[in-house]
Amino acid sequence: EIPLRLVGSEMCIRDRNYPNIESNDFYVDATAMYLITQPQNFDVIVTSNLFGDILSDEGAGLVGGLGLAPSGNIGDDHGLFEPVHGSAPDIAGKGIANPCSMILTIAMMLDYLKEYEISNKINKAVENVVSAGKTLTPDLGGNSTTSELTKSIVDEILEGDY
């Protein structure tokens, strides 16, 4: 049984199709507060695109920002994966974009494809490099470039023993 949180009218339709899934219906403002005060109570949130975009940006803020947030839209038959952040035209060509969101999105996609070993390795490598704090882009408080952070993560994937 997977706890499921829904925002909006989708819950009534879902309840008929999946009676074994525990769910709750919250207004979006309450959901935003609960994501801050009780994030452990959420496994899945189903909502409209507008509210989902707002809540996912809030969730990204809890883990360090959009540069660290992967994203997956998973349907019955297919999954679509993309980093949460946008194209960031204000930093285009400057070599300072944080690659972690894209790399973590790749790991999420690999997990969806049941490639668990490499997915876990990528996730652990990103965690280790970011936690070490030696090679960080400006959004994470460092002064490294996109290429330098990417290289550190790739090196950690290749050299890591996990």
Positions of predicted regions on the chain:
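Glycine-rich phosphate/pyrophosphate-binding loop and the adjoining helix
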Residues: 116, 125-162
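Glycine-rich phosphate/nucleotide-binding loop
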Residues: 33-121, 125-134
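Hydrophobic alpha-helical scaffolding
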Residues: 21, 25, 44-45, 95-96, ...
